[in-house]
């Protein structure tokens, strides 16, 4: 019986037959015990199909014993098949525009929310739907990319009188930036340390005001954040102020007030609009003179998704004045849809190997396909938008591979840094080091070089806290190899234990932003600044370098009126073989149309930005600064050259200079060398004429 009990039961059989004829009629087959038949039903003979082979007892024991042996691996036949995750699959999404109804069709929900908050009217959408789609794709992609910091451009600023400066700029950051920690207005980087970059004071009499005060919604959000940051800023009340520009990722969620407003932000709207008066309680710090959305941005090129340029993670951006990372808000006023909720939409298809090389699990981003590609098809009255694809999520194995590659990359970068930095102890070369600022990416000191008595700025960065160290190398090399009187001077660098020390020229005059927001410049002074910047640009372009982030934040001034270009964290090195770029880099309000529309571009993007900066010197702010960033991008793409307020008050030479800079057709736009010969520059006054403006800006902010 034991042998009978060990036999497996017979497999189930059909109780009815599908066969025709009289052989099988009505009945079925009963299954009994372990044998066949076991009692037939009617006249139907038992099913004669053979049972499965009975397993051999010896084989069963061998398998059991083998499974208990430690370290033994099951044979290929015994193990479950390893089914991999799908790769290179695509989820296509088509967005169209119905010209009859004036509505977009098939638009992702996140895009719809973004567009709803963009202040782009229905008429404007109907006028140029392709421009709307272009900026939506770009904007969405920017918010999802995990940007990396331009580490040597941190606006580390402590404030005199709890003042806040315009948050300068530039690149993306995965940690709270120094600009955020201290609200610096500095545009310079280590590349240029500035003194006295602070915001407008309530007693400033010669402020160049332009633009409008933003709505109540902006003010309420700003007030809330200011209340959060007040305790930290109060601690810095009496500290000395120096800025080193922070490169920032631009996340378009800045809570802002008009850059030209010289009033403090306080607890209510009336205080925002009227003069400030002493309060019994400590007054809240003033808002930044420029909104956070004046930060720079960096996205991947259309044709290149190499891991080296895939930015690092970043939390949603905060206002310029937000002191701590936990004070950040997940969504912005200007563009609430720029929050992480957009990360669920379809994105570019990433190659598996590139995906594995990332340092993080890629989140979906919008596909960046040119309008002329195969996915841009026009059907009927609809404008088709490029398809989008979803990259597969990274598996644990992928993440492990990512971490391994990241570690190897860090080792290579550190080895490269060792070949760049100087050997020795900087503490012996520099004395009287005084801490003047601290932020997420490092601490800034002023020091005296013992041998020369020259004052320098030293930034100390903990390399373990820098997620994209290769950008540090890029910036150091560009600065070291491109020395010019109009470029902030890189002096030296050292590796001290786990820290990188970078020594830069110290410019105490502050950034040009302080001057344009605090004072009124005449054409002679504007021409002088333009000439100096053009000399720097002509030098860089001749050496195949595009700056890509020209704006007043990145122009530093000496007390003698010297003008120097800084912030090379996002510069591009071009070559005859690769003379064009498509990476979205810069700050939206200063961006050239070809950058906004994702066309290939070259050095002339810097000349467009110079033209916008010239308008900034006239009006106190760039065009469209009071617009939602998404709408500003739309207006740049649609209108091209912006309108200039009171243009008739400008000289004909200045008007022509602006026309040459702001020519939409790149081939017709003047080069830096051409503009250096322009008659407008003959109006330039001596650089010493800038000194009174610098001192006036300092005086205006002194009481803040």
From Swiss-Prot:
Region (Disordered): 1-87, 159-188, 254-292
Keywords, comma-separated and alphabetical: ATP-binding, Cell junction, Cell projection, Cytoplasm, Developmental protein, Kinase, Nucleotide-binding, Serine/threonine-protein kinase, Transferase
Compositionally biased spans, kind Gly residues: 23-42
Protein name per its UniProtKB record: Serine/threonine-protein kinase Pak
Enzyme active site: 549
GO biological process assignments: autophagic cell death; axon guidance; cell adhesion; cell migration; cellular response to starvation; dorsal closure; dorsal closure, spreading of leading edge cells; imaginal disc-derived leg morphogenesis
Record motif PXXP motif (SH3-binding), residues: 9-12
Localization per record: Cytoplasm; Cell junction, Focal adhesion; Cell projection, Axon; Cell projection, Growth cone
Organism (species): Drosophila melanogaster
Function: Protein kinase involved in intracellular signaling pathways downstream of integrins and receptor-type kinases that plays an important role in cytoskeleton dynamics, in cell adhesion, migration, proliferation, apoptosis, mitosis, and in vesicle-mediated transport processes. May be required for the formation of dendritic spines and excitatory synapses. During muscle embryogenesis, promotes proper muscle morphogenesis, as well as guidance and targeting of subsets of myotubes.
Biased composition (Low complexity): 159-178, 255-266
Biased composition (Basic residues): 61-73
Ranges for region Linker: 97-429
EC primary class: transferase
Catalytic activity: L-seryl-[protein] + ATP = O-phospho-L-seryl-[protein] + ADP + H(+); L-threonyl-[protein] + ATP = O-phospho-L-threonyl-[protein] + ADP + H(+)
GO annotation, cellular component aspect: cell leading edge; cytoplasm; cytoskeleton; cytosol; focal adhesion; growth cone; lateral plasma membrane; muscle cell postsynaptic specialization
EC number: 2.7.11.1
Signal peptide positions (record): none
Domain Protein kinase: 430-681
């Amino acid at each position: 019986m034991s042998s009978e009990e060990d036999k497996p039961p017979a497999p189930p059989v059909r109780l009815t037959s599908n066969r025709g004829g009289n052989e099988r009629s009505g009945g079925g087959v009963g299954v009994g015990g372990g044998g066949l038949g076991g009692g037939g039903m009617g006249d139907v003979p038992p099913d004669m199909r053979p049972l499965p082979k009975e397993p051999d007892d010896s084989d069963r024991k061998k398998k059991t014993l083998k499974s208990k042996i430690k370290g033994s691996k099951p044979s290929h036949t015994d193990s479950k098949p390893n089914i991999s995750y799908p790769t290179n699959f695509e989820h296509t999404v088509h967005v169209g525009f119905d010209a009859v109804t004036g509505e977009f069709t098939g638009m992702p929900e996140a895009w719809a929310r973004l567009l709803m908050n963009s202040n782009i009217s229905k008429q404007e959408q109907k006028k140029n739907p392709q421009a709307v789609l272009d900026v939506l794709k770009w904007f969405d992609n920017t918010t999802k990319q995990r940007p990396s910091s331009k580490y040597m451009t941190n606006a580390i600023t402590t404030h005199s009188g709890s003042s806040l400066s315009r948050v300068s700029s530039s690149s993306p950051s995965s940690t709270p930036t120094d600009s955020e920690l201290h609200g610096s207005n500095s545009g310079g980087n280590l590349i240029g340390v500035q003194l006295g970059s602070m915001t407008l004071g309530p007693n400033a009499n010669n402020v160049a005001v332009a633009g409008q005060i933003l709505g109540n919604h902006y003010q309420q959000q700003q007030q809330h954040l200011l209340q959060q940051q007040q305790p930290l800023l109060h601690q810095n009340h009496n500290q000395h102020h120096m800025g080193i520009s922070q490169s920032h990722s631009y996340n378009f969620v800045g809570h802002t007030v008009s850059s030209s407003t010289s009033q403090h932000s306080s607890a209510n709207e009336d205080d925002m609009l009227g003069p400030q008066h002493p309060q019994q309680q400590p007054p809240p710090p003033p808002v930044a003179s420029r909104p956070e959305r004046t930060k720079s941005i960096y996205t991947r090129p259309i044709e290149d998704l190499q891991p080296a340029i895939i930015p690092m993670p970043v939390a949603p951006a905060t206002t310029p004045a937000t002191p701590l990372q936990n004070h950040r808000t997940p969504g912005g006023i200007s563009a609430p849809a720029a929050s992480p909720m957009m990360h669920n939409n379809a994105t570019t298809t990433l190659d598996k190997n590139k995906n594995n090389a990332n340092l993080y699990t890629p989140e979906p981003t919008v596909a960046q396909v040119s309008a002329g590609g195969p996915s841009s098809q026009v059907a009927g009255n609809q404008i088709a938008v490029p398809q989008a694809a979803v990259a597969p999520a990274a598996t644990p194995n992928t993440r492990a591979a990512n971490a391994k590659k990241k570690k190897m990359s860090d080792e290579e970068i550190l080895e490269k840094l060792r070949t760049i930095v100087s050997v020795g102890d900087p503490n012996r070369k520099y004395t009287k080091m005084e801490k003047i600022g601290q932020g997420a990416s490092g601490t800034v000191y002023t020091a005296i070089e013992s041998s020369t008595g020259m004052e320098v700025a030293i930034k100390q960065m903990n390399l373990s806290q820098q997620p994209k160290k290769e950008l540090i190398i890029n910036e150091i090399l560009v600065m070291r190899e491109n020395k010019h009187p109009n470029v902030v001077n890189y002096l030296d660098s050292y590796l001290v234990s786990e820290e990188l020390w970078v020594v830069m020229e110290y410019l105490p005059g502050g950034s040009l932003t302080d001057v344009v927001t605090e004072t009124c410049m005449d054409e002679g002074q504007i021409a002088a600044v333009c000439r100096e910047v053009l000399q720097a640009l002509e030098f860089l372009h001749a050496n195949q370098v595009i700056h890509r982030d020209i704006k007043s934040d990145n122009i530093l001034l000496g007390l003698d009126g010297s003008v120097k270009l800084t912030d090379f964290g996002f510069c591009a090195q071009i070559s005859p073989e690769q003379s064009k770029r498509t990476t979205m880099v810069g700050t939206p309000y200063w961006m050239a149309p070809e950058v906004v529309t994702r066309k290939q571009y070259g050095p002339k993007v810097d000349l467009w930005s110079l033209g916008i900066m010239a308008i900034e010197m006239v009006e106190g702010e760039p065009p469209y600064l009071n617009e939602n960033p998404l709408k500003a991008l739309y207006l740049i793409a649609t209108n091209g050259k912006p309108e200039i307020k009171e243009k008739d008050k400008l000289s004909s030479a200045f008007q022509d200079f602006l026309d040459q800079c702001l020519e939409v057709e790149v081939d017709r736009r003047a080069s830096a060398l051409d503009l250096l010969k322009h008659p407008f520059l003959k109006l330039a006054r001596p650089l010493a004429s800038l000194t009174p403006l610098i001192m006036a800006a300092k005086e205006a902010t002194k009481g803040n």
